[in-house]
Amino acid sequence: MDRVVIIGGGWSGCAAALAARKAGAEVTLVEKTDMLLGLGNVGGIMRNNGRFTAAEENIALGADELFGITDKLSRHVNIDFPGHKHASLYDVIKVEPHVKRLLEEKGINIKTIARAVDVVMDNQKTSNGDKLMKAIILSDDTEIAGDVFVECTGSTGPMGNCLTYGNGCCMCILRCPAFGPRVSITQKAGMNDIMGHRKDGAFGAFSGSGKLEKSSLSDEIQRELNEKGVVVIPLKPEEVSKDKLDLKVCQQYALNEYAQNIVLLDTGYAKIMTPFFPLEKLRRVPGLENARYADPYAGGKGNSIRYLSVAERDDKMRVTGIENLLC
C-alpha cells in the first residue's frame, strides 16, 4: 500500500487526504495547529456563482463527502449579495469537528500540533533528473516517511511576512504565535517558490474579510442576519476607501459595492467583507456601535497576508523538479 503524507490540514489538505484514502493509500495528515480546516474555520461561502457548478461536478465525480458536510451545516442557502448569486453559508463554528470525524472514520491518521519544518531527500534521482523526497521532519524531530507527499500548507505566514508585507500579525485563526510559523516544504526540498504581487508591486495580498461577534451588533442587524443571511449597510462618502479593494486575495469580492457598503454575511459570526476596518470608524456605523472583532482579533488594523509562497508545478499538480511532491 502506498504511503501518502499530506502536510497541512486546511480544506485542500483534508480533500487530498480523503481522495488518497479512497484511492487505497495509507494516509497521514499533519496539521501544525490543534484544528483542521485552517482558514476554512473563518470562510463559510459556498456555491456562489460558478462555485455551484464546481461543487456539482465534484459531487458527480464521486467527491461528495465534504460538500455534504458544508451543505448540511449551511445556515443559509440560495442567498444573493453584491456580485454573487445563489450562495450557501456554512456555519464556521460547527464545521471542523464534522470534517475531522469523517476523516477519522475513513481511516486517515491525523496528527495535530505537528508542524513540518524540514524534509529528508533521497540520494537517488529519477531518470529525468528529478529529486525524490523520503520523509518530512516535524518540529519535535519526528520523521514521517512516505512514498508520495502533498504540500497543502497554504501561502500565509510566518508572522514576519505579515509584518513586512502587511500591517503586522493581526492574530488570525492560523495562530502562528502559539503553533509556530508555516514552513515551505518545496523550499526545504531545494526548489523555489513564487511570490504574488499586488497592483502596486508589493508582495502578497490581504485576506479579504474578518469576523465580528454577532452578539455585539444591534438587535435589528442580528435579526436580519439570522433571517436573511446578509446585511448591506451604506457608508458615508467620507468613510469609503476603494484602495482596499486592490489589496484583497479574492478579487471576486473587490467590487465597488464592498467599498461603498459594509457587507455582513451570517456564517455563525458576522462575516465582514473587507480586509480590515478601523474599529473606531466601524463603531460610528448605525447598528455597529458595540462591534467587536472575533477574527482576526486586530481586524481593525489589518489581516493575514497570503500568496507569499506558491510552488511551481505542472498541470497534474506535481511540483517542478520533485517526482513525488504534489501541491
Predicted regions and their residues:
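N-terminal Rossmann-like FAD-binding beta1-loop-alpha1 element of flavoenzymes
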Residues: 3-28
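Redox-cofactor binding/interface segments in oxidoreductases and associated redox assembly factors
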Residues: 7, 151-152, 327
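Conserved N-terminal/central alpha/beta ligand/cofactor-binding core
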Residues: 19, 25-26, 31-115, 158, ...
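Helix-loop-beta segment of a Rossmann-like dinucleotide-binding subdomain
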Residues: 75-92, 135, 203-208, 261-268
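General small-molecule cofactor/ligand-binding pocket signal
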Residues: 109-111, 291, 326
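Predominantly flavin-linked oxidoreductase catalytic cores and closely associated redox partners
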Residues: 110-258
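Flavin-binding catalytic cores
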Residues: 214-240, 256-303
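FAD-binding beta-loop-beta segment adjacent to the flavin cofactor pocket
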Residues: 301-327
